[in-house]
Amino acid sequence: APAFSDACDREGMLFWSEVSFWGTAGPKVDGGWTASAYPVKEQDIEGFERNVLRQLEEMIRIHRNHPSVFVWSMCNEPFFTDGKTIPGVKSLLKKMVDTAHRLDPTRKAAVGGAQRPLGKDRIDGIGDVAGYNGDGANIADFQQPGIPSVVTEYGSTTAGRPGKYMAGWGDLGRDEGWKGREWRSGQAIWCGFDHGSIFGENMARMGIVDYFRLPKRAWYWYRNEYGHEAPPAWPQEGV
């Protein structure tokens, strides 16, 4: 919504604006939220592609005059799809990139969640910018990819509040997906805030700030890592 991009402009936040072309792990059965990211049935393809391209155009026309938007992202993890549809995924992404360039020549087009597939079916080079979620930052195939890249989902740990700091595979202390790599732009934590989700309660509690917009312990940990501001004293068991 324009209210969101207005807020990003006002607060000085970068906005990775993304189309809702995505997939997720689970059975690739039509009718459920784990279904194939790209249609399995031929009769569904034309309508699906038309809808995705229309959403892309709407997104760009709504937000393109907002300085907080620094990239247009075509997707998130579309590799969670029926294996035989990968050619269709790649073809649609190319159409989307061309459309984004036509509607807004001033911004780059990104392929988000591009850490799979590997080998000949890679999708990370289809756009101008590649976003590698999670372990994709360290996969050999994606080192020095030849285009700008960023770690687009880093962390993904579930915690409550006040909670205990949960160090996941994205822990800054041991993750080298971006440090010292001049060809990688940085990383974005997944995620800022707890949120509603069709994935269930646990998948919705990966924020470093909870539903009530109160910081979890992880928030203070990141503040210390980036801003060198020590966290508060925490209650000790039995005290």
Question: What residues fall within each predicted segment?
Answer:
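Ligand-binding pocket scaffold of soluble enzyme catalytic domains
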Residues: 93, 97, 107, 147, ...
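Glycine-rich beta-alpha junction loops
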Residues: 78, 156, 191-195
